[in-house]
Amino acid sequence: MTRPHSFDPYLEPWLTSRVPRMAEYRAQLAEFREWVLTDVDAQANYTDRYAPPALETYDRHGEVVNRIVTNRWYEEQHQDLYRRGIIGLPYVEDAPHLLTFAMGYLLAQADISLHCPVTLTGAIAYVLATHAPDSVRQRYLYDVIRMDGQAKTGGTWATEQHGGSDVGATTTVAAAAGDRFALHGLKWFTSNANSGLAVATARPEGAPPGSSGLGLYLVPSHLEDGEPNHFRIRKLKDKLGTKGLPTGEIDLLGAEAIQIAPPPTGFKLMMEALEYSRVHNAVGSVGIQRRSLAEALAWARTRRAFGHVLADYPMVQHELLRMRVQFEAGALLAFEAAIAFDEVQQTSERRTWLRLVTALAKYLTAEWAIVASRSALELVGGNGYTSDYPVARLLRDAQVLTVWEGPANIQALELLRLLAPRYQGWEQYRARLKGVLDRLPDGMANLSHALEQRLQGDTEASRITLRDEQSSQSYARKLLHRLAQSLAFALLCETAGEAYLRGNSLPAHSAWRFYEELDPPAFGAENQAARRGVLELLDEPELQAVGKR
């Protein structure tokens, strides 16, 4: 049974064992989760179906107002998130960033359209707190970390019409204007387009081409005298999902901006902001996995067909088992990145590992979120295809998670960079998996052998990929997929080993079940003990209750 004040029966014990301080926030997270899965979930459904944001260009007197109107429920909950400290706690109370990543994971189970602006606001807070000049930090940081219901929300403006990932080709120009800059250009895809503060990439006049010529600038929505800044929202995007999130095209018409970093540092700082956002993307993807599993399980436990509830049928059980084990693997992978983010705040020696694990986690969890939401919709059937059930929204919203903050090919290129000798990424990856291998108990020989074989295969795959430029370009994405899966398996093995020493064999069943997905046994030769073991996890009362709300 679920312990009182448990925010997640699977993740909570793992997080508190890795970061004991997280036990202090158990009740706070449990209350946050209850609010998210009731009030926020209801708002998300309402906003998605009936009250998405709208662009108001002129007021009733014909004056240009150029503002985005969101419904009051969305707006109130957006501010309530900041009031609850989803951005401010690490700065106001010195909480670990891991706490706010856990809050993001819970929030994503109900509303990705709120999780996105929270992520962007957090990225701005991080850049201001760690890299902005003292005068800029003192003037603007409080605006995004305050917890009194008056916080300004954030945006990151990098994508231009020529493409999102090729930031080095930025055409926005930053012209010096006294102690500030005037930005001219078009930002093509701006999430949370009604943000109070945004960071934008731009090229100062006379700067060289490419990413080395980019500076990073803070763009307030309003000037010091209260007048709107000099930019125009051209339109709101009509999107497949995240209907509650205002995403726009913004013309910068001499927008007043404050320099955070000149070239060549500007691009580097935007990439650090992306690191933060990619971790949130990963935990948000796992939130979608978790909610999809809950909806599928609740339906399977109650829906009857051909005289039996769906959950009694082996084919349905197989699908639920796969969803459960992939959720566990995704959760460990995403929060491995979240923990690494906090470690980097203590020592820069962990930055290569942060970048590497974040690329792996961002890629694989986003893929799995789509698989999980699609599986939930298929299991619920025709009802799931309607807006009366949340799985349709989950599926639509999940699609963007592979695109936000860099698609798979971009993560693969990041992996290639980190595996180069300069960064020692392969050595750190191998050391992490070898460390798990060395600590596995003697009674887990099967898992130990499987992980050792997996690491040997990773070594060969990396050698082939890195042998020359053509191989790197051909195999980078396949290597990304393989290493992400291997790391997820290693984390499952690590958790299983710790549980085994406490007399709990269920995590070992999950790890073996996951391994059988990576290296399928002969037809009909699946480990039935592992299958029965994971089935026990589907009896978790708390998990079933989510889907019944």
Language-model regions, residue ranges each:
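Conserved phosphate/anionic-ligand binding catalytic regions in large, soluble enzymes, centered on
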Residues: 112-119, 282-285, 289, 367, ...
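A glycine-rich, basic-preceded beta-loop-alpha segment at the flavin cofactor/substrate interface
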Residues: 225-230, 234, 239, 246-277, ...
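A short core secondary-structure module
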Residues: 180, 184-230
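C-terminal amphipathic alpha-helical interaction region
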Residues: 439-549
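Glycine-rich phosphate/cofactor-binding loops in nucleotide/flavin-utilizing enzymes
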Residues: 2-15, 383-446, 512-549
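C-terminal helix-coil-helix/basic helical segment that borders enzyme active sites and/or dimer interfaces
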Residues: 328-362, 377-378, 463-474, 494-500
